[in-house]
Every structure is written in C-alpha cells, then in structure tokens.
Amino acid sequence: MTIKKYKTALSGMFPEEIQSFCGLKEKFRAQQIFHWIASGVNSFDEMTNLSFDMRSKLKNDFSLFSTKIKEALKDKDGTIKLAVELYDGSVIETVLLTDKAKRKTACVSCQAGCPMKCAFCKTGQIGFLRNLSASEIVEQFLHLEREAGSLDNIVFMGMGEPMLNLPEIDKAINILAHPKGRNLSKRRITISTSGLCKGIYEMADKGPEVRLAVSLTTADETLRSELMPITKTNSLDELKQAIKYFNSKSNKRVTLELALMKGLNTDKKAAQEVIEFAKGLECFINLIPWNPVEGLNFKTPSETEVRTFETYLKKAGLNISTRQKRGQSIGGACGQLGSTAARSNRF
C-alpha cells in the first residue's frame, strides 16, 4: 500500500484537488486516479490506464493513503474489527457489521479517542487526541471493503463525537458519494451524536440527505447528566427541540438509541420518560443492551428485562427494534471500541 509518513493523502481529495495537488495538466487524469482510489487499489502501480512514467512519478512524489491496518480481528458472527494506524502513529478502530439479511455496514470513527466521557462507553474512558481528517475517515471504509467486499451502509458510530468534526465528515461523505468515485448513496449514511444540539442544527440547515441518530439512553435528566456529561450543557428540552428542527428541515425521522443497563434505565418509569420525550417527534427507537467493558460496573440486562421494556414502548405506539449482539468477543460491539487504541496511544 502506498503510504508515506505525512498526513496529506490523495484519498481525502476530490478530483479537482488531486489535479491541483499533483500538478496534472489533464482533468481526466485526476478523475482516473480518484476512481482508482474508490475502487480499492493499494498502489499507483495498479492504475493501469496511467503511463508507466506517470505512475512512477506519482509513486515517488505523493501518497495514496495515510493509514495502514495494525490489527484485524474477526468474530465468529462475522463481525470484523480493524485497528488502523494513522500517519502520526495514533490508532483508531473501525468495524464491519453484517446483519441477518447479509447487508454490510461500516461503523467508522471520526476522532482518535473521544472527549464526551460517557460513563458506559469504553472510548469515553480512554481520553481524546484529535479529530480525524477526511482521508482518515475515507480510508476506514476502503480498508473494510478490501476485507469484506462491497459495503452497503456507513454509520458514524465508532470512536468520537461526529458533531465536533462535521467539516471533515462532510468532506469524507461527499468523496464516498461522488458519482465518479464510490458513488455511495447518502441515504445509506447515518451520523450518530451524543446530543450536541449545535451540530444537529448545523446538519439540519444543510438540508441533509444523510440520516441522524441520537444516543438518548435515558430521558431522566439527572441520570443522563451522570451517564452523559453533555446533558449538563445540552439539556433534554434543548435536545428535543433540536430533533424537532431536524425533523422539519429534513423530512426524515431520527433514530433514538438507548443503551440499556440492568436495573438502571429499564423499568416502567424509565420507559414512560422515553415515551414522553418521544411525543411530537418523528422517531424510531433502537434498544441496545449494554455490551460489557472491562473496568466498568454496569451490567447487561436480561432478555426478559429487555423484552418487558420493549413492551412498554410498543404499547405506547412507538416503532422500535433491539440491536443484536455482534462483535462482543473482539471488543467490536457498541460501546466497546478503544482496547487497541488504549494500548497504542498516549492520551
């Protein structure tokens, strides 16, 4: 794979940027390079419609990629987790999820670490280094496609808070959706936030084609403040108004994600609070039984506990689903990312 020890990589550029950066006279040459990158080549040598001399010059002067796979793990359920080393030696993690219908979803990271400090999340416990560049985001998707073939969806639910890195995420999305490249439909892309209202408004005002998910977890203000410190500066009332605004601007329903923890947010009172929060919203509820994280004292709810909670919500007319456990044995399930990064990075 063509990698050099600096952060500027062609994978994070549009065709016109490649043309300018590489000093190419012909626009179509840049488009050819852009298409090759999206096709998953590992080096300039594989770009067979470029002359040998051009490939040699490009190889000597430029870098296709700025990241490489440090570690690859595969769960028996088909989940793949990659630890990806960045140009500066930092490590992030990205996951491939395959559902029962064989749809493949890339769960990508947008930051090295995470500053949000959610109490139930591994990534929130390991600290924060920096935002990722568009190339570092795009390359996660490309690495996963090389491992597993063509992917169907992208969710920004890996390491980091997407609303703190929207410019680079937006660029990465537009690169992957570019008609002369990967041409991925934006409707197959979801951005998940812990509840940073400013970012939700910013997304809404762009007239988003992508989907929004919000990690709600609980609609009890006091409990949510303890579990998710973001609540202290972005209250539940403010969050609900931001979601309503997104509904109105996008004509899309928002997914509310609830990480369920045994004896903490799964009783009838917790359900009633979620039902009340959801009133007036175009939303879908995704229940996520908590995945064990070493060093954290939360517990996974029993199946009976989850089913009872489901019933409360369904009786209120809410549309819900419960996420299947995938990737637990390799630390690749929701809330578990960061084990390799914690060993490798200096937070």
Curated annotation (Swiss-Prot):
Q: Where does [4Fe-4S] cluster bind?
A: 114, 118, 121
Instruction: Tell me where in or outside the cell this protein is found.
Output: Cytoplasm
The Radical SAM core domain sits at: 100-323
Which residues of this UniProt protein bind S-adenosyl-L-methionine? 160-161, 192, 215-217, 291
InterPro entries linked: Aldolase_TIM, Elp3/MiaA/NifB-like_rSAM, Methyltransferase_A, RlmN_N, RNA_MTrfase_RlmN, rRNA_lsu_MTrfase_RlmN/Cfr, rSAM
**Gene3D superfamilies given in the database record:** 1.10.150.530, Aldolase class I (3.20.20.70)
The record's remark on the cofactor is: Binds 1 [4Fe-4S] cluster. The cluster is coordinated with 3 cysteines and an exchangeable S-adenosyl-L-methionine.
What are the TM regions of this chain, as residue ranges? none
> Which coenzyme or cofactor does it need?
[4Fe-4S] cluster
Q: Where is the active site?
A: 93 (proton acceptor), 334 (s-methylcysteine intermediate)
Q: Which domain of life is it from?
A: Bacteria
Per the record, the GO terms for biological process are: rRNA base methylation; tRNA methylation
Q: Which UniProt keywords apply?
A: 4Fe-4S, Cytoplasm, Disulfide bond, Iron, Iron-sulfur, Metal-binding, Methyltransferase, rRNA processing, S-adenosyl-L-methionine, Transferase, tRNA processing
Positions of disulphide bridges: 107-334
Keyword Secreted on entry? no
Give EC number(s), comma-separated.
2.1.1.192
Q: What is its main location?
A: cytoplasm
| Known catalytic reactions | adenosine(2503) in 23S rRNA + 2 reduced [2Fe-2S]-[ferredoxin] + 2 S-adenosyl-L-methionine = 2-methyladenosine(2503) in 23S rRNA + 5'-deoxyadenosine + L-methionine + 2 oxidized [2Fe-2S]-[ferredoxin] + S-adenosyl-L-homocysteine; adenosine(37) in tRNA + 2 reduced [2Fe-2S]-[ferredoxin] + 2 S-adenosyl-L-methionine = 2-methyladenosine(37) in tRNA + 5'-deoxyadenosine + L-methionine + 2 oxidized [2Fe-2S]-[ferredoxin] + S-adenosyl-L-homocysteine
Provide the function of this protein.
Specifically methylates position 2 of adenine 2503 in 23S rRNA and position 2 of adenine 37 in tRNAs.
So what family is this one in?
Belongs to the radical SAM superfamily. RlmN family.
User: What PANTHER family has UniProt attached to this entry?
Assistant: 23S RRNA METHYLTRANSFERASE, RADICAL SAM CORE DOMAIN-CONTAINING PROTEIN
Q: What else is known?
A: Reaction proceeds by a ping-pong mechanism involving intermediate methylation of a conserved cysteine residue.
In its UniProt entry, what is this protein called?
Answer: Probable dual-specificity RNA methyltransferase RlmN
Q: Which organism is it from?
A: Treponema denticola (strain ATCC 35405 / DSM 14222 / CIP 103919 / JCM 8153 / KCTC 15104)
This chain is encoded by the gene named rlmN
